[in-house]
Amino acid sequence: MPNTILKLERIRKDLELSRSIRQTIIPNLSLSIERGEFVTITGPSGSGKSTLLYLMGGLDKPTSGSVWLDGDELTAKNESEMNRIRNEKIGFIYQFHFLLPEFTAVENVSMPMLINGRRSRKEIRDRAMMLLDLVELQDKYTNKPNQMSGGQQQRVAIARALANEPKVLLGDEPTGNLDSRSANNVYQLFDRLNRELQQTIIVVTHDEAFANRASRRIHLVDGQVAYDRQLRTEASVTNEAASLVS
């Protein structure tokens, strides 16, 4: 379907514990993500949430089955091709920000664009500053990570993930190390990116409040979808956004 950005077909993932012992993490899972969706993935520890996210992002390959992203079959790509796809089409945000400590906010956000090599130095710097403006860090351009709070560091990481205009933004517990206020700020940023830029966002989270504020929630148990629920219509998203600024 033209509106499907990510599709998983009959995915199985086994973890090889030894030559004779395998543990099945995901036994047989199929699902699709539509363009512009804001999806949270929840479930108990060991349910396969992060494994599923890494399969979606091409950081791991399934034992069997196929993963499609924006028309590319990730499971058919070699590592060189996957490096290109990850750089160009996927933005990753982790529980820890992984910012380079010796670089400023602008330099950290610039890094994926420098690797991509499709913009001039001026274009890269201009876009890095624009993205920092977008995440409301316009006064932190020259700050290094140790000169920012945890919430600010994570917002720099989000700006970095957006650097190459990814088709999909993937987050693995992005608020896990943050206090409740900073976590709420990150949620509101994701919500704004989704509403205003129609950015497709998929986030693994243990945070129930965060999980239920997305437009769709997928809950895993033992590597299988226990439920897949639409949480909000476009109208309810607009009404909630209005209440936040009223």
UniProtKB/Swiss-Prot annotation:
CDD domains: ABC_MJ0796_LolCDE_FtsE (cd03255). ATP binds at residues 43-50. Pfam families: ABC_tran. It is an enzyme of class 7 (translocase). Keywords: ATP-binding, Cell inner membrane, Cell membrane, Membrane, Nucleotide-binding, Translocase, Transport. The complex is composed of two ATP-binding proteins (LolD) and two transmembrane proteins (LolC and LolE). Its main location: membrane. Its EC number is 7.6.2.-. It is found in: Cell inner membrane. One of its GO terms (cellular component) is plasma membrane. Part of the ABC transporter complex LolCDE involved in the translocation of mature outer membrane-directed lipoproteins, from the inner membrane to the periplasmic chaperone, LolA. Responsible for the formation of the LolA-lipoprotein complex in an ATP-dependent manner. Belongs to the ABC transporter superfamily. Lipoprotein translocase (TC 3.A.1.125) family. It is a peripheral membrane protein. SMART domains: AAA. Residues 6-244 form the ABC transporter domain. GO terms for molecular function: ATP binding; ATP hydrolysis activity. InterPro entries: AAA+_ATPase, ABC_transporter-like_ATP-bd, ABC_transporter-like_CS, MacB-like_ATP-bd, P-loop_NTPase. The keyword Repeat does not apply. This is Lipoprotein-releasing system ATP-binding protein LolD 1. The lineage of its organism: Bacteria, Pseudomonadati, Chlorobiota, Chlorobiia, Chlorobiales.
